[in-house]
């Protein structure tokens, strides 16, 4: 049995890509996209018609160029999501514009718009996750959306404070990042880490155990992997979203795979929810989390702007 098949027996495997061919090849349960993945997918020739459709949709809706860009961008992300939903049996994660990461109201409105585009295409809410950065404002937006039946995937999650606040808000799923945490520590400490000592692996392990310990239903989906060792060290996590090159490596390996994450203890009484002040105090104790959250939002914003430049040339 391949490591990928062994992993499927203990963890829901998700593909972290917008590439249809890769998704067909590895047959994941779900798929996740983000602005960077949408940007790289939009360069593939098979997506030309999806871009043309998004542009036509935007032109029909408005004469205002700025509004056309926003509409085309949303429609392209949904068009790619619709193609992926033809292949995966589960859910697609589609991300809210990262530039709205500190605006609760605008995030809620954008999430509703994305969901409406899916609904108009005949897709029900239970096949979509709306991806939102795990800022305090994003978490508050998700709390509102979850009550409306719009499930959310809180991403760019680097600190225990972010994870705790998401669970307390009743968020459907979180994506704690592994590889980007490793990147920070390698740069800061100037050293290499074995998978078991990997700070990203330790972070996800702690979050997983915290959620199970307090009986939170929020799904933990490890994300952002730099190597297969990081994946095998958190085998047993609720879900793992994995890029195609690492899915390939897992599929080609027959090395034994041992379940690493499994909580068997008692469920404890939950603490009182974090206040905004407590959230910021705890999150800001972690320089890695501060830097990586801000950097992640900036990087996604840059890729959204590149995507807009590509779309603007067609509008």
Curated annotation (Swiss-Prot):
Pathway: Carbohydrate degradation; pentose phosphate pathway; D-glyceraldehyde 3-phosphate and beta-D-fructose 6-phosphate from D-ribose 5-phosphate and D-xylulose 5-phosphate (non-oxidative stage): step 2/3. Keywords: Cytoplasm, Pentose shunt, Schiff base, Transferase. GO terms for molecular function: transaldolase activity. The keyword Ubl conjugation does not apply. CDD domains: Transaldolase_TalAB. The active site is at residue 131. Its EC number is 2.2.1.2. GO terms for biological process: carbohydrate metabolic process; pentose-phosphate shunt. InterPro entries: Aldolase_TIM, TAL/FSA, Transaldolase_1, Transaldolase_AS. PROSITE patterns: TRANSALDOLASE_1, TRANSALDOLASE_2. NCBIfam families: PRK12346.1, talAB. Homodimer. Belongs to the transaldolase family. Type 1 subfamily. This is Transaldolase. It comes from Actinobacillus pleuropneumoniae serotype 7 (strain AP76). The lineage of its organism: Bacteria, Pseudomonadati, Pseudomonadota, Gammaproteobacteria, Pasteurellales.
